[in-house]
């Protein structure tokens, strides 16, 4: 009986050893299987990476397709413009001609708002009124400038006309030259007259001396020289008077405008300085307002 029991014990021990061996083999195979099979997290990250790469490649191809299509459209449009350029001018000319020949009917014309029409007519009226009143304003400015420059109380046109009609160059005998006093009514015109007569008197002396000679045939020539000299003196006096008055008026207007402009700039700068001071005091200081 001892031998069968020993045989049974040996079988049991061998069976236990085989079970341990098989269990170890199972554990090893399961570990190797887990190491070989990728984890779901890594699989998901790899799938996302592949999707991103695929989207980037698709975007590159789409941009290339768009660029190719845009270049083809530009070339096609350039070819169409080159082919239709000659016909376009003819068609435009014909369209302009037809539009010029066809009158706008009240049914097809675009109706404007009454306020816009009223404002346009008002601006046109103001423009024409300005054109009409502009010469009068210029005349008033010149008149005030002449009066202030020439120290005259009368109108400069009236003074010029009076000088042209009543001023005389030669005396009653025709051998003397007339010079007007400072207390006369001609004013500054009389002074300019005296200056021109004084500086041109040597030229006319020969004519005045030889007027009573024994050459009757040359009397009419001397008379013509006298008339020309009288005309020269009057025209020169009036031109100098006008030049003096206009230049003085322009100078006064320019100086006044410059003075007003400087005063305006000064007031604006002072106002800005005061405004900055008030703003800074209101921001930094205690509440005043």
UniProtKB/Swiss-Prot annotation:
It is found in: Nucleus inner membrane. Residues 28-50 are annotated as: Disordered. One of its GO terms (biological process) is ubiquitin-dependent protein catabolic process. Residues 28-37 have a biased composition (Basic and acidic residues). Residues 1-222, 269-289 are nuclear. Not glycosylated. Keywords: Membrane, Nucleus, Transmembrane, Transmembrane helix. GO terms for cellular component: Asi complex; endoplasmic reticulum; nuclear inner membrane. Component of the Asi complex, which contains ASI1, ASI2 and ASI3. Part of the nuclear inner membrane (INM)-specific branch of the ER-associated degradation (ERAD) pathway, required for the elimination of misfolded proteins in the INM, a specialized ER subdomain. Required for ERG11 degradation. Negative regulator of SPS-sensor signaling. Together with ASI2 and ASI3, prevents the unprocessed precursor forms of STP1 and STP2 that escape cytoplasmic anchoring from inducing SPS-sensor-regulated genes in the absence of inducing signals. This is Protein ASI2. It comes from Saccharomyces cerevisiae (strain ATCC 204508 / S288c).
């Amino acid at each position: 009986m001892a031998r069968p029991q020993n045989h049974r014990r040996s079988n049991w021990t061998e069976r236990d050893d085989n079970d341990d061996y098989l269990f170890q083999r199972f554990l090893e195979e399961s570990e190797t299987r887990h190491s070989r099979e990728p984890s779901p997290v890594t699989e998901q990250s790899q799938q996302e990476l592949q999707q991103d790469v695929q989207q980037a490649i698709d975007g590159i191809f789409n941009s290339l397709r768009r660029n190719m299509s845009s270049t083809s459209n530009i070339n096609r449009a350039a070819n169409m413009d080159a082919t239709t350029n000659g016909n376009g001018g003819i068609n435009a000319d014909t369209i302009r001609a037809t539009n010029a020949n066809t009158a706008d009917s009240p049914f097809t014309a675009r109706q404007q708002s009454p306020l816009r029409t009223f404002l346009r007519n008002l601006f046109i009226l103001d423009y024409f009124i300005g054109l009409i009143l502009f010469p009068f304003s210029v005349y008033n400015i010149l008149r005030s400038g002449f009066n202030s420059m020439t120290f005259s109380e009368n109108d400069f046109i009236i003074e010029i006309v009076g000088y042209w009609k009543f001023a005389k160059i030669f005396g009653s005998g025709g051998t003397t030259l007339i010079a007007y006093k400072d207390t006369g009514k001609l004013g500054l015109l009389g002074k300019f007259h005296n200056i021109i007569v004084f500086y041109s008197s040597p030229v006319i002396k020969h004519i005045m001396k030889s007027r009573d000679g024994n050459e009757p045939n040359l009397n009419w020539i001397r008379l013509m020289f006298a008339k020309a000299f009288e005309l020269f003196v009057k025209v020169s006096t009036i031109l100098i008077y006008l030049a003096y008055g206009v230049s003085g008026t322009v100078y006064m207007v320019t100086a006044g405008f410059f003075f007003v402009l400087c005063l305006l700039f000064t007031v604006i700068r002072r106002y800005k300085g005061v405004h900055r001071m008030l703003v800074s005091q209101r921001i930094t200081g205690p509440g005043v307002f």
